[in-house]
Protein backbone atom coordinates (compact mmCIF):
# COMPACT_ATOMS: atom_id res chain seq x y z
CA UNK A 1 0.00 0.00 0.00
CA UNK A 2 1.31 3.43 -0.89
CA UNK A 3 1.72 6.06 1.75
CA UNK A 4 0.64 9.65 1.30
CA UNK A 5 2.44 11.84 -1.20
CA UNK A 6 5.43 13.79 0.16
CA UNK A 7 4.86 17.52 0.53
CA UNK A 8 7.04 19.52 -1.87
CA UNK A 9 9.67 21.58 -0.04
CA UNK A 10 9.29 25.34 -0.14
CA UNK A 11 12.38 26.82 -1.80
CA UNK A 12 13.08 30.42 -0.86
CA UNK A 13 13.96 32.92 -3.61
CA UNK A 14 17.64 33.76 -4.08
CA UNK A 15 18.99 36.97 -2.47
CA UNK A 16 20.23 38.67 -5.69
CA UNK A 17 17.43 38.16 -8.24
CA UNK A 18 14.58 37.11 -5.94
CA UNK A 19 13.93 34.05 -8.14
CA UNK A 20 13.11 30.54 -6.92
CA UNK A 21 14.42 29.14 -10.22
CA UNK A 22 17.90 30.53 -9.52
CA UNK A 23 17.88 28.98 -6.03
CA UNK A 24 16.95 25.61 -7.52
CA UNK A 25 19.84 25.88 -10.00
CA UNK A 26 22.23 26.84 -7.17
CA UNK A 27 21.08 23.86 -5.10
CA UNK A 28 21.57 21.52 -8.06
CA UNK A 29 25.10 22.80 -8.71
CA UNK A 30 26.10 22.75 -5.03
CA UNK A 31 28.52 20.04 -3.92
CA UNK A 32 29.32 19.16 -0.29
CA UNK A 33 27.06 21.93 1.02
CA UNK A 34 29.23 24.70 -0.47
CA UNK A 35 26.42 27.03 -1.40
CA UNK A 36 28.48 30.23 -1.70
CA UNK A 37 30.64 28.61 -4.41
CA UNK A 38 27.53 27.37 -6.23
CA UNK A 39 26.03 30.88 -6.04
CA UNK A 40 29.20 32.40 -7.52
CA UNK A 41 29.01 29.92 -10.40
CA UNK A 42 25.33 30.60 -11.17
CA UNK A 43 25.54 34.39 -10.75
CA UNK A 44 28.71 34.45 -12.86
CA UNK A 45 26.98 32.43 -15.57
CA UNK A 46 24.00 34.84 -15.55
CA UNK A 47 26.42 37.80 -15.86
CA UNK A 48 28.13 36.11 -18.83
CA UNK A 49 24.69 35.55 -20.41
CA UNK A 50 23.78 39.24 -20.13
CA UNK A 51 27.17 40.24 -21.62
CA UNK A 52 26.90 37.83 -24.55
CA UNK A 53 23.26 38.55 -25.41
CA UNK A 54 23.00 42.20 -24.43
CA UNK A 55 19.70 41.33 -22.76
CA UNK A 56 18.70 40.90 -19.13
CA UNK A 57 20.60 37.80 -17.97
CA UNK A 58 17.81 36.51 -15.74
CA UNK A 59 15.29 36.66 -18.60
CA UNK A 60 17.66 34.69 -20.85
CA UNK A 61 18.15 32.20 -17.97
CA UNK A 62 14.38 31.72 -17.53
CA UNK A 63 13.78 31.33 -21.27
CA UNK A 64 16.62 28.79 -21.55
CA UNK A 65 15.04 26.62 -18.86
CA UNK A 66 11.61 27.06 -20.46
CA UNK A 67 13.02 25.83 -23.79
CA UNK A 68 14.49 22.67 -22.23
CA UNK A 69 11.36 21.61 -20.29
CA UNK A 70 9.98 18.31 -21.61
CA UNK A 71 6.26 17.88 -22.33
CA UNK A 72 6.03 14.07 -22.28
CA UNK A 73 8.28 11.29 -21.02
CA UNK A 74 8.11 7.51 -20.83
CA UNK A 75 7.68 5.56 -17.61
CA UNK A 76 7.98 1.80 -17.29
CA UNK A 77 4.75 -0.07 -16.56
CA UNK A 78 4.70 -3.79 -15.93
CA UNK A 79 1.73 -5.59 -17.44
CA UNK A 80 1.44 -9.37 -17.55
CA UNK A 81 5.15 -10.12 -17.34
CA UNK A 82 6.13 -7.53 -19.95
CA UNK A 83 7.45 -4.07 -19.16
CA UNK A 84 6.15 -1.36 -21.47
CA UNK A 85 7.52 2.15 -21.81
CA UNK A 86 4.32 4.16 -21.40
CA UNK A 87 4.30 7.83 -22.47
CA UNK A 88 2.93 10.16 -19.79
CA UNK A 89 2.62 13.92 -19.55
CA UNK A 90 5.22 15.54 -17.29
CA UNK A 91 3.90 17.48 -14.29
CA UNK A 92 5.04 21.12 -13.97
CA UNK A 93 7.45 20.75 -10.99
CA UNK A 94 9.14 17.76 -12.65
CA UNK A 95 9.49 19.67 -15.96
CA UNK A 96 11.56 22.32 -14.21
CA UNK A 97 13.56 19.77 -12.22
CA UNK A 98 14.45 17.80 -15.35
CA UNK A 99 15.38 20.93 -17.32
CA UNK A 100 17.72 22.15 -14.55
CA UNK A 101 19.20 18.66 -14.06
CA UNK A 102 19.92 18.21 -17.78
CA UNK A 103 21.53 21.64 -18.15
CA UNK A 104 23.76 21.16 -15.07
CA UNK A 105 24.76 17.59 -16.01
CA UNK A 106 25.70 18.63 -19.54
CA UNK A 107 27.67 21.65 -18.29
CA UNK A 108 29.53 19.38 -15.83
CA UNK A 109 30.37 16.84 -18.52
CA UNK A 110 32.22 19.44 -20.64
CA UNK A 111 35.96 19.78 -20.05
CA UNK A 112 38.58 22.49 -20.14
CA UNK A 113 36.68 25.58 -18.96
CA UNK A 114 35.55 27.01 -15.62
CA UNK A 115 32.07 25.87 -14.57
CA UNK A 116 30.68 29.43 -14.91
CA UNK A 117 31.58 29.50 -18.59
CA UNK A 118 30.34 25.95 -19.24
CA UNK A 119 27.01 26.70 -17.56
CA UNK A 120 26.64 30.03 -19.41
CA UNK A 121 27.44 28.30 -22.71
CA UNK A 122 24.86 25.57 -22.13
CA UNK A 123 22.21 28.12 -21.03
CA UNK A 124 22.93 30.22 -24.12
CA UNK A 125 22.59 27.15 -26.34
CA UNK A 126 19.30 26.28 -24.63
CA UNK A 127 18.11 29.87 -25.09
CA UNK A 128 18.85 29.55 -28.83
CA UNK A 129 17.14 26.11 -28.98
CA UNK A 130 20.40 24.33 -29.77
CA UNK A 131 22.85 22.26 -27.75
CA UNK A 132 22.86 19.00 -25.83
CA UNK A 133 20.07 19.85 -23.36
CA UNK A 134 17.63 20.53 -26.21
CA UNK A 135 18.79 17.29 -27.88
CA UNK A 136 18.09 15.45 -24.62
CA UNK A 137 14.55 16.87 -24.56
CA UNK A 138 14.04 15.90 -28.20
CA UNK A 139 15.25 12.36 -27.46
CA UNK A 140 12.76 12.05 -24.60
CA UNK A 141 9.97 13.30 -26.88
CA UNK A 142 11.01 10.87 -29.65
CA UNK A 143 10.97 7.99 -27.17
CA UNK A 144 7.45 8.97 -26.08
CA UNK A 145 6.34 9.27 -29.71
CA UNK A 146 7.79 5.85 -30.55
CA UNK A 147 5.88 4.28 -27.65
CA UNK A 148 2.61 6.04 -28.38
CA UNK A 149 0.96 2.67 -29.01
CA UNK A 150 1.18 2.00 -25.26
CA UNK A 151 -0.45 5.30 -24.27
CA UNK A 152 -3.65 3.46 -23.31
CA UNK A 153 -1.74 1.86 -20.40
CA UNK A 154 -1.52 5.23 -18.65
CA UNK A 155 -2.45 5.32 -14.99
From Swiss-Prot:
One Pfam family it belongs to: Ribosomal_S7
Presence of keyword GTP-binding: no
Superkingdom of the source species: Bacteria
The keyword rRNA-binding appears for this protein: yes
Keywords: Ribonucleoprotein, Ribosomal protein, RNA-binding, rRNA-binding, tRNA-binding
Gene Ontology terms, MF aspect: rRNA binding; structural constituent of ribosome; tRNA binding
GO cellular component, one term: small ribosomal subunit
A GO BP annotation: translation
Function: One of the primary rRNA binding proteins, it binds directly to 16S rRNA where it nucleates assembly of the head domain of the 30S subunit. Is located at the subunit interface close to the decoding center, probably blocks exit of the E-site tRNA.
HAMAP family according to UniProt: Ribosomal_uS7_B (MF_00480_B)
Protein family (similarity comment): Belongs to the universal ribosomal protein uS7 family.
Description of how the protein assembles with itself and partners: Part of the 30S ribosomal subunit. Contacts proteins S9 and S11.
Protein name, as recorded: Small ribosomal subunit protein uS7
UniProt organism field: Fervidobacterium nodosum (strain ATCC 35602 / DSM 5306 / Rt17-B1)
